[in-house]
């Protein structure tokens, strides 16, 4: 009877150890999963609804954990009446050249394009549609300097970066 009690106690200890080991394994795996999520680079593309004037914006946000890495805003919009008249007189190709020449003479655009991490591209997609693509690479862009430039000061880059990317995305989706 005495031997039986010892064997019973020994088995009970082993069962307790096995449960503790399983629990330790599970707990040690959780930080790995959390760290993997923090180290994952995520890219999300938001296609916002068309506005009343026919403009449509697409935003591509790339981030890692709570840090924005880049933002690309693509804006497609109908051409203005003034631009339509110019296109009718000169054609799409010549109008595209004239748009680029105008940008090359615009001091605010010239100043903004000098910033590392900022890109601006304007394309005349057709006789009726214009596309502007603005890209911000936050890994190299001097946001403070960018926010002071005439061309970029009303975009609110500093406020954008105060948000967590996931909150910015959910706000954009909620507000269109």
Regions found by a protein language model. Name each.
Residues 10-12:
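Bacterial signal peptide processing site
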Residues 5-8:
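C-terminal motif of bacterial Sec signal peptides marking the signal peptidase cleavage site
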Residues 22-176:
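Subset-of-secretome marker
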